[in-house]
Amino acid sequence: MTLKELSQLYYLNREIEEDQRRLDELKSQSRSISAQKITGMPRGGTIAGSAIDRYIAEIVDLEAIISAKITQCLHERSRLERYIAGIPDSLTRQIFTLRFINGLSWLQVALHIGGNTADSVRMTCYRYIDRENKKERA
């Protein structure tokens, strides 16, 4: 498995967070349109109605996208966990889990494990990936 493949869960989670922020923003904007003050002045209902309809459609679409990404995230996590479970060395498994499943930085991984630097855990990871990729090519 490549570093790019291992990092997909992290980036997928970031996409979901960004989509969730956008969804919250859309919901807030749609509430502000529907909560406009009634002044008694004649107004055309189609403009506000169509704006609300657009927001609702966009919200529904974005919720479906988020749901699909969450499902994809669960599959990706399962795939990573199976790969990591196949790593024979316990320390390397811990490094991979903390980095690629939990999404910690190299420094956070080193601090969590203890007795290692960010560079040492990073190099342990990269060396393992290089070894495995060389085995696959051979």
Language-model segment annotations:
Residues 1-83, 134-138:
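N-terminal interaction/assembly modules
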Residues 29, 98, 112:
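Short acidic/histidine-centered micro-motifs embedded in hydrophobic/aromatic stretches
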Residues 86-87, 115:
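Short, conserved sequence motifs enriched in acidic/basic residues, glycine, and aromatics
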Residues 88-102:
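Short amphipathic alpha helix immediately N-terminal
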Residues 103-105, 116:
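Residue-level signal for the short linker/turn that defines the boundary of a DNA-recognition helix
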Residues 107-111:
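Short alpha-helical "recognition helix" segments of helix-turn-helix
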Residues 113-124:
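Short, basic interhelical loop/turn and adjoining N-cap
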Residues 125, 129:
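DNA major-groove recognition helix of helix-turn-helix
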